[in-house]
Structure formats: C-alpha cells, structure tokens
Regions:
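Short, well-ordered helical secondary-structure segments
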Residues: 6-8, 19, 59-60, 64, ...
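Alpha-helical cap/lid subdomain in secreted, periplasmic
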Residues: 5-6, 11, 84, 106-258
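N-terminal secretory targeting modules
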Residues: 1-70, 252-254, 258
Length: 258
C-alpha cells in the first residue's frame, strides 16, 4: 500500500507550497534590497553626492523699469505654471524636480545670481525632509539640520547681493501613498511644521521676507484641505492660484521699496 504522502496530488501540493515559499522569500529579499538602495539614494541626495543639473535658462536683461523675479526650488517650483501676473514684472522659473537644498547650491550661481534678479522667491526643503523620514536613515536630524543650515546660507548670500528674498513656508504634505508608507516614517507633517518655524525665525532675524501659506492649505487651524493636492507632495492649479494671489499682493510692495 502506497502512503498518501507520496501520491501525485500530495507531491504537487508540496511542490506548490515550496515554490510559493521560495517566491515569497525572493520577493522579501528584493524588497529589502530595494529599500536599502532607496535609503542610500535619498541619503546621498540630501548630502549633495551625485550629479547635478541646471535649468539651462538663457540670461535676458530686464527691460527698463521692470522687476525680475526668480522662482527657485524643487518640483513644487518647476510645476508653478503660470507664474503670478504682475505689471512690469517678469518671472524666471528655476525649479528642478527632486532637488534637495544641498543640490540647489550647485546651481545657485548659474540659475539665480547670474540672472541678476531683483527678488528671489524660494520654495524648498521638502525633499530634504522626505529623505529624513526615509526608513533606514540612521540620523534623520542630521539631514534636517543640514537643510536648515542651507536655508540660512541662501538668506545670507542673497542679502550680501542686495537681492530681496521671499521664503515661502514649505507646503504641507497630503496623505501618503501606499509605496510611501512602506518607505517613509509618519513624521513628515510634524517635521514640515517645525522646520517652517525655524526658517521663519531665520528670515525675520536676517531681514528676509517670510510668506506663510498655511491659509492656502488648511480649512482652519488643523484640517488639511486635501483638495489642493494631486498626490502626497504636489499641489494643483487651485493651490497655485491662491499662492499667486498672495504674491501679487506682496511683491509690488518689495519692488517699490528698492
């Protein structure tokens, strides 16, 4: 009599179970490798290790009587279309997707100072903060501190050039997508709020202008308006329209004071 354990159906079942276990193990191993690579990638970018880009914008002299404004930052600036419509004001978009504040330093001369702007509007820092919340980063505070130091650098450098600076509050984040839940800790919102407080202090102590955009993204003091977002980090046309309104009120007053 043959044991049922060795029956064709049983052997097929055992093979199927072993194959699925092997597949599960392989998927787990690949996930850990991907997680490790992603962690290294985010850490190195936060430190500015790797390649850097520039916008390759051609220099154009401002017509007499016109104010030149450079929008400087990451994808949140790159997606900032259209810019505010202000009489006698031209805007140059110097935003590059994914950049940290350290990476932005490499192109600061080429993409900002070279244009000899009257005003610079900065929206930056979120990519440093998402690097800091990446699972596996050993010292998240190190990356946050570097970002704060970089923001002080921009404030000081533009002040030395007698260029007016408007630092906008770092836009908040919306709900994490499923992939981001796998790779990011949940402290991003708090880190953005804390960093905004610190950057606001830098701006006020150095004579720069800080534009708090909380009212664009919050229905009241705490309820985030998710209708202003297209994904976890990026905002939609309605949000940009509200930001443009705020800048349209602020920038002319800065132009008149020059």
């Amino acid at each position: 009599m043959k044991l049922s354990f060795f029956s064709p159906k049983t052997r097929l079942l055992v093979i199927s179970v072993l194959a699925n276990l092997a597949l599960l193990f392989a998927c787990g191993w690949l996930f850990l490798q991907a997680k490790s690579s992603y962690t290294d990638y985010r850490y190195f970018r936060a430190l500015g290790i790797g390649t850097s880009e520039s916008t390759n914008l051609k220099y154009e002299a401002s017509p007499a009587g016109e104010t030149k404004v450079v929008l400087f930052g990451d994808s949140r600036v790159q997606n900032w279309i259209p810019a505010p419509e202000i009489d006698n004001t031209i805007f140059i978009n110097a935003g590059i997707n994914g950049e940290t504040t350290t990476e932005m330093q490499r192109r600061f001369q080429h993409d900002v100072l070279r244009h000899q702007p009257d005003i610079v509007v900065m929206q930056a820092g979120v990519n440093d903060l998402t690097a800091a919340v990446t699972r596996g980063i050993e010292d998240p505070q190190e990356l946050i501190d570097i970002m704060h130091s970089n923001m002080q650098y921009y404030i000081d450098a533009l002040k030395d050039q007698n260029i007016q600076l408007v630092i906008t509050s770092i836009f908040p984040n919306s709900t994490y997508s499923i992939p981001k839940r796998l790779f990011w800790h949940g402290s991003l919102s708090a880190d953005i709020i804390n960093s905004n407080r610190i950057i606001e202090g830098f701006a006020h102590s150095s004579g720069a202008n800080y534009l708090d955009l909380s009212s664009v993204f919050y229905r009241d003091s705490s309820a985030l308006n998710r209708d202003m977002f297209i994904d976890t980090l990026h905002i939609n046309a309605s949000a940009y329209s509200e930001i443009n309104k705020a800048l349209s009120e602020l920038l002319p007053t800065l132009s008149q004071s020059q």
